[in-house]
């Protein structure tokens, strides 16, 4: 990786989400009317950022070392667990499966923290064209997932909202103070 050197990957793609990433999303979109699911709960970073002001309905993770949440693969859920929205930082390789599964559960409000180039792969363009009611909210800083002080990955929130008009909104999110 240019600028950062190769990094050892977590076997399940688990990287704690810095709270400023979640705060920026919460500033851009109002989620207070939703009951939120976090299907990649990991160490609870997103849940911790949500809890003071938002309803968290359910959190799970496939990782047996996940803290204080149900150990379960989101892709095996057969109900929305009473949740109306998803906010998560999924393993990038599973993003499309997560989106499709969430829609199959009836969860139409979804936010995923992803690499900026997520839709650069031709195999993912189908998802874009099927669900154009979404926003792309690019972070104006590079999140430090590893806590090493020299992050190299540009990130964006991809937000699906089944009640929006069939358009794609693009915006920038400033880093919260």
Regions found by a protein language model. Give the residues of each.
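Class I S-adenosyl-L-methionine-dependent methyltransferase catalytic core
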Residues: 1-177
């Amino acid at each position: 990786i240019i600028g950062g050197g190769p990094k050892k990957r977590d076997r399940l793609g688990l990287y704690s989400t810095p709270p400023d990433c979640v705060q920026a999303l919460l500033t851009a979109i109002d989620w207070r009317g939703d009951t939120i699911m976090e299907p990649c709960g990991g160490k609870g970073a997103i849940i911790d950022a949500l809890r003071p002001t938002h309803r968290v309905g359910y959190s799970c993770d496939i990782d047996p070392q996940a803290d204080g949440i149900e150990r379960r693969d989101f892709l095996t859920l057969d109900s929305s667990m009473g949740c109306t929205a998803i906010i998560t930082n999924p393993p990038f390789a599973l993003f499309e499966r997560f989106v499709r599964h969430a829609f199959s559960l009836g969860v139409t409000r979804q936010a995923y923290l992803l690499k900026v180039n997520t839709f650069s792969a031709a195999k993912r363009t189908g998802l874009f064209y099927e669900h154009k009611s979404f926003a792309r909210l690019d972070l104006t800083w590079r999140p430090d997932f590893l806590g090493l002080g020299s992050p190299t990955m540009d990130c964006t929130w991809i937000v699906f909202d089944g009640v929006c008009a069939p358009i794609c909104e693009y915006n920038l999110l400033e880093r919260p103070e």
